Amino acid sequence: MTAGPDPAPDTSAASSPSPVRERAESVLRVLVGRDDVALREDQWRAIEALVIGRRRALVVQRTGWGKSAVYFVATVLVREGWASWRPGRPTPAPGSRSGVGPRSGPTVIISPLLALMRDQVAAARRAGISAVTMNSANAAQWPAIEEQVRTGDVDVLLVSPERLNNPTFRDEILPRLAAGAGLVVVDEAHCISDWGHDFRPDYRRIRTLLAGLPPRTPVLATTATANARVTADVAEQLGGTAPGLRDAEVLVVRGTLERDSLHLGVRRLPDAAARLAWLTDYVRRAPGSGIVYCLTVSAAQEIAERLREAGLEVAPYTGRTDAADREQLEEDLKTNRVRALVATSALGMGFDKPDLAFVVHMGAPDSPVSYYQQVGRAGRGVDRAEVVLLPGAEDRSIWDWFGSQGFPPEPEVRAVLTALDEATREGGGPLSTNLLETVTSLRRTRLESMLKVLDVDGAVRRVQGGWESTGRPWAYDAERYARVEAARIAEQEAMERYEALEAPECRMAFLRSALDDPVMPAHWRCGSCDLCGGLVLKRAARADDVEAARASLARVGVVLTPRRQWPAGMDRLGLPALRGRIAASERAGTGMAVGRMDGLGVAAALRGLIEQDDAAEVPLGLRPSVLQVAERLTALMAEDGDDTGGDAGSDDGPPPSGVVVIESRRRPRLVRQVGRALSRHLSAAPLGVVGAAGEPGRHDVGSAFRLAQVARSLTLADWSHEALTGLQGASVVLVDDWTDSGWTLAVAARLLLRAGAARVHPFVLAQR
């Protein structure tokens, strides 16, 4: 928000600035709490375009440049009436609200993250700007906030893009806000573009919002991470559909991406243990506090646990972290109460700690743009910050998985549109997301993302109670989706080139080039990265530290929580008996997996095993882990009383008396080998195999579809009378190779319990 880590007065300003600029400078000084700062010329150019020209502007500037200063200063000027001031007239009084009126209501800021909102509200209030938020957490306060807006008591209103898709907000509140807004700000505007690294479907509605604004309503879009293609796309969306507004009238202020405080480096290490040992030593020695980024939730949780065991004050921060806990963790890092947060990309845009001293990536993001955005958290207010990438062998497979979650193929989209069209014709009312899961194989998050895109495209509409068809024709833009996919792959390849750079190449020069920095000189080198000699990284951790890390990662075992509720709408899939809560007498007990496929430690061995379609046996090195987790499951079964399937009235569970294997079409020899090994090790009788009819179903489908697949496939039809007799009252260990949705285990356990088993506890090699 300030003009730099150590901003000096801008001597390039005119010797006799206009009264508007003088007032803007005074607002900036209050905003940053210093008397020796001045607006940069490009900051002033954007403010002038917004306030005096009432134009639309896109500001693409690096983190720390002062983008929020532009819209907060512009807000004060608009609210005080400077937009209508002309030379020769009296100047508005500082702090007045003479500009408040039908055309000079509050600034509406669309901001993607609660963390970003919190920081922005705090910054605004320090400058005497009245700022409030409207989000899902304070819906009860919306009427009071609306009244404050109506009476002119609110200068800045922050809303999340998700609010734009809320029917009540979209239809009742948003039109009134848009009609009276003095300024509209789209923060983190790269999210508008589906070419961008962080495209969000909710942002697509912003284009519709902007098109409906009254003429000459100023609009500012800001981002720190946009290459030339994304910049052009966002600029087009800012101006391309506004009545009477030509694209050329969108002011684009784009600056250098150079960050001279950042010292970039890459260290390639042979395996997860070597990386963890190196990271532990680095975090222990690093000055100040920082962020350790991971690609998955499992990795973040596991690494945080290992670092804490090494005596380091760290905490995990992921998309699964409770909102209140996130706020506390952010404050802990800002005040240096923790050495580091071990985070996924959930800690990203908007987090502001000027003295953040380091950022380490345990695994590479899938694009240079995304990487630059994350490392930009460091070094904003200090002369030196270190940024280290520790690539992992699993990075590419993780990228591919996230990439597979893009816009669905046309048949999946058409299935949803057809279902909504039929519901509308038959007068059946809107369909909930739960019901739509029964007409498509898409998983919930992908389905919801697709519906948001269709909503913005005008094909469907979100209403109270679900979704309905608009009846408008809709075309599947296969060519565009193919281009986006090709761009994604190209960015992954660029990230791999970044990892492989060698001297005399320069890491910051590579990132600036990848982001199409408009002012980077030819043959420029930063002088600060490891290839330029500005950062010297320890080559490897000590051998004993690596062995300690290896021992730590060798710990295995993941608790599997059983499914407790059938998905809604199973009657639409021909399975009406599967509804509501799963009866305790038909529910699996708590189970165990040897490990997660997206974690560290045994994850690599498990991935290699599960990816073999005809794997015959567990590798020798993994067998002790399998038996160790089996013993943990036995202990868990002894402790697991009322919360297991079967005899819900007992206090303690008996030890396992039998082993049942779920038939695998892809790895039949593997699961049978595991079943035999557990039967011997646990002294539990081999009771039989849950059969699987037909071809194995897909795992990359929605919850209801996956349940329907396994419910129609799994069977005990081949069990003999003798086998069923042996099942009566048995405490069963149910063996499968891996689990994802949990429905295979739930259905198999239900079959066994209904056939007479007393308890069923799942055991799998891997959890995905």
Regions inferred by a protein language model and the residue ranges of each:
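Mobile, glycine- and charge-enriched loop segments
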Residues: 722-734, 739, 767
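Helicase motor core with emphasis on the C-terminal RecA-like subdomain
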Residues: 18, 22, 26-31, 41, ...
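Active-site-facing substrate-recognition patch
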Residues: 262, 552-658, 668, 672-676, ...
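Acidic, metal-coordinating catalytic cores used for nucleic-acid/nucleotide bond scission
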Residues: 297-298, 321, 663-670
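Active-site signature of alpha/beta-hydrolase-fold catalytic machinery across serine-
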Residues: 72-73, 77, 233, 673, ...
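C-terminal accessory region of SF2 helicases/translocases
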Residues: 338, 364-373, 379-586
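Intrinsically disordered, low-complexity terminal tails and inter-domain linkers enriched
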Residues: 5-19, 81-104, 241-248, 639-655, ...
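PRPP-dependent phosphoribosyltransferase catalytic core
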Residues: 746-768
